[in-house]
Each structure stands twice: as structure tokens, then as C-alpha cells.
């Protein structure tokens, strides 16, 4: 028998009661992992209105530094302006919707100029120039800046965005209050961590399979032979809140001396941060479609760490996430086959994925209820038109198109 098969996994949690883990719990159905309709609903209910962790503020040391992101087809930019503030906006020109920021995923610019008709914008997203529009009446430059995105920098320096176009999205504190004040992280100097490299791995798997897999170590003894060098898999801990999952483990004295003290936090819906003395990883699961996703990794190195100390952990994690990719591809293949509906999860050893699934279930049902009451799809990230005559006419045109897609005037078009 292999060493891996001899290992036993034990997960403790402050969330359990004496009666809460006596029976297995049924997981989400497989249709939630491959349905195109569910994927579209998730774009509206989750990725258009939830706070999303993107990166760390130390990626923007100078004015003009910018990074480009894409979440379920929503491409947006985060940039530092000349006042030192970070701003986020959709990468959509207000004139004819052409992408304004091009040329890679990051860079430094003094201004953002659209290559279609020459409209240009400042680092805060305000419209700077619209050629020949100064000849027109009733054109307000102040109302034609890039579509702003809500942005928050937490106490640790992590940068969050919320794509909800309303003035008042759900508060960040609703799900994450205090998550940037963790006692186990109070001695971490976040300024010591600088980007070493980043990479992505695309695959044929739903993003939630990645989340389920990351948030339990029940599979670790079977599939990750390197992990016992990082922690004692027999003494792991998983604590959960409504929007977060905290993972920790016990290290031997030798592991502590090697800088293996691990603290991992998953942030619903699709990001996590793993930090150790020599290494930090920001992991983002980015949906590309109902059954395809990208695993994106930003790898930071402690500037005070040696090459050996950093690579001992960085190389281990690179192997682990590659192994996880293979697991998720295999599981997704069988979910798509239409035989498997759902399995029974261990309420203690798989407490993390169960917590994730419950958060997701609640968010989906909450938004679906709003849509049923409204009698239409609700896209929180969508542009809100002003209340003027031209905009009202535009709304009528849009309503016609909406009725076509919803089958509202099928009888008129039938022949």
C-alpha cells in the first residue's frame, strides 16, 4: 500500500455542532455544472453584482499603471490615476463600443485613446476628447466617460470590483466584513510580496468544479503526493462564513522552519488567496462558458526570501494545480454524459464545498426570484440610459428586440 493511501484526513471546523455532520449531504445537481441557461443566469446573478477579488494594489506602483481583466465576457480595466487613486471601468468606448485599452494585459499609459474614432479618456475614465463633438449642442462630456465600476481596496491591499451599474451595489461588508482583519495574518507585511510570475490554465470544466475541488482536502492523500511536505493532512481546519472559507493546517517544527505556515482564504464566488512566509498566490477561477474555464494564478515572492525557499513552495503549488486540472477535466466529462445527477458529500471532510454550494444556491435563487417578479431578465452590469427623449426612443427599440428573443410577438411574425 502506498504512503498516500495510508494517510488519513481529518478536518475540524468551528462551525460544526454535535448533530450537524451525522449524515451525508446531497450536492448541487449536475445540470448546474453544464447548463447554458444556468451559465447565463450566473452571469446576471453572480458576476454582474457580486464583489470580485482581482489582484493586489502593489501591481500598480506608478501613475498610469493599468491591468486588464475579463470576467464572463465583461472586459474591464483597473488603472492608477495621477492622484494615486485606483479606478475601474469597462473597456468599452462610449461612442461605438470599441475596446479602448489594447496591447496586452497590462501597461502604463498617460491617456486611453480609442483607435476607432479617436475618442480619448483620462486615467480616471473621464472623457478628454471627442473629435468634432464640440460643434454639437447638448453633448455633455461629463456624462460620456467610460462606464465606471465600483472598486474597493481592503485593509490588506487586495483590489475588489463590483460590476453592478447601480450607484449603490450590495455592500462589500455584507459578506466580507472583518475578513481583512484575520488574527492569523496580523503579522504579514503585504508590501514584502512582489509579483514573480503569472500564468493561466484553460480546460473543459465548469468553474464551480474548480471551486468544489479547491475547498476540500479529502482528495489530497489520493492525488497530491507532495502535500504532506507542506502540512499534516491529518490536522486541517476549515471555517466558513457566508462569503468566505478559511483553510489552515498544522505544521511540524521542521515545516515551520522551512516557511510552510499556510493560510488560505476562499472568497465567494471565484477567488482565493494563499499566503506563506515566502510565497503568496492569488487564484481566480474565470468562467469561459458552461463547461470551460480558466484557472489564473498570480504568484508573489517575498522579497526577503531566498530562491530556494520560494521555489520549494511555488514549484509544489504548480504541480498541485496541474493535478487538480486533470481531476476537474475527468469529473466534468462524466457530468456532461448525463448519467450522474448528484453525489452525497461528507459534511465534515467536504464542509468547504458544501458551504460554497450553499452560498451559490442562495445567490442564484435570490436573483431568479427578482427576475420572476419583474417578468424579465435583470442584467445588473448593463448601462442605464438617461431619461431624455432620444433615450426613451432607444428603449422602445430595445423592448422590441427583447420581445423577439422572449417570443412575445411570435404570432405577429408567424407565416
Role assignments for model-derived ranges:
Residues 9-31, 191:
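Short, contiguous pre-domain boundary segments
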Residues 59-165, 169-175:
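Rieske [2Fe-2S] iron-sulfur-binding domain
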Residues 3, 85, 91, 152-415:
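C-terminal catalytic domain of Rieske-type non-heme iron oxygenases
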Residues 10-18, 123, 180-186, 256-257:
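Short, flexible segments with low predicted structural confidence
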Residues 47-51, 98, 219:
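Generic structural signal for secondary-structure transition and capping sites
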Amino acid at each position: 500500500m502506498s504512503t498516500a493511501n495510508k494517510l488519513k484526513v481529518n478536518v475540524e471546523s468551528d462551525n460544526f455542532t454535535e448533530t450537524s455532520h451525522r449524515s451525508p449531504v446531497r450536492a448541487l445537481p449536475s445540470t448546474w455544472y453544464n447548463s447554458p441557461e444556468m451559465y447565463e443566469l450566473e452571469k446576471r446573478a453572480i458576476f454582474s453584482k457580486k464583489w470580485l477579488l482581482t489582484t493586489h494594489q502593489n501591481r500598480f506602483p506608478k501613475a498610469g499603471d493599468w491591468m486588464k481583466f475579463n470576467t464572463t465576457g465583461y472586459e474591464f480595466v483597473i488603472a492608477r490615476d495621477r492622484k494615486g487613486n485606483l479606478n475601474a471601468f469597462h473597456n468599452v468606448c462610449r461612442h461605438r463600443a470599441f475596446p479602448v485599452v489594447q496591447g496586452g494585459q497590462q501597461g502604463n499609459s498617460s491617456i486611453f485613446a480609442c483607435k476607432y474614432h479617436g475618442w480619448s479618456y483620462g486615467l480616471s475614465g473621464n472623457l478628454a476628447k471627442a473629435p468634432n463633438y464640440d460643434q454639437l449642442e447638448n453633448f455633455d462630456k461629463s456624462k460620456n466617460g467610460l462606464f465606471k465600476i465600483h472598486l474597493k481596496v481592503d485593509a490588506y491591499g487586495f483590489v475588489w470590483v463590483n460590476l453592478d451599474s447601480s450607484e449603490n451595489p450590495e455592500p462589500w461588508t455584507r459578506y466580507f466584513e472583518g475578513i481583512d482583519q484575520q488574527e492569523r495574518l496580523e503579522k504579514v507585511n503585504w508590501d514584502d510580496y512582489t509579483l514573480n510570475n503569472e500564468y493561466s490554465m484553460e480546460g473543459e470544466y465548469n468553474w464551480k468544479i474548480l471551486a468544489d475541488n479547491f475547498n476540500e482536502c479529502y482528495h489530497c492523500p489520493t492525488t497530491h503526493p507532495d502535500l504532506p511536505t507542506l502540512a499534516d493532512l491529518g490536522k486541517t481546519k476549515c471555517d466558513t462564513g457566508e462569503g468566505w472559507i478559511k483553510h489552515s493546517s498544522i505544521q511540524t517544527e521542521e515545516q515551520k522552519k522551512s516557511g510552510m505556515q499556510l493560510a488560505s482564504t476562499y472568497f465567494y464566488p471565484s477567488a482565493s488567496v494563499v499566503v506563506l512566509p515566502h510565497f503568496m498566490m492569488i487564484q481566480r477561477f474565470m468562467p469561459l462558458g458552461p463547461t470551460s474555464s480558466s484557472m489564473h494564478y498570480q504568484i508573489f515572492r517575498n522579497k526577503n526570501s531566498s530562491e530556494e525557499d520560494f521555489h520549494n513552495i511555488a514549484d509544489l503549488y504548480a504541480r498541485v494545480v496541474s493535478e487538480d486540472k486533470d481531476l476537474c477535466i475527468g469529473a466534468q466529462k462524466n457530468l456532461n454524459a448525463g448519467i450522474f445527477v448528484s453525489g452525497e458529500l461528507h459534511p465534515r471532510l467536504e464542509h468547504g464545498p458544501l458551504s460554497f454550494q450553499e452560498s451559490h444556491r442562495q445567490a442564484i435563487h435570490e436573483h431568479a426570484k427578482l427576475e420572476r417578479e419583474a417578468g424579465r431578465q435583470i442584467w445588473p452590469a448593463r448601462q442605464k440610459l438617461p431619461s431624455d427623449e432620444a433615450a426613451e426612443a432607444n428603449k422602445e427599440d430595445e423592448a422590441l428586440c427583447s420581445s423577439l428573443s422572449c417570443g412575445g410577438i411570435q404570432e405577429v411574425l408567424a407565416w
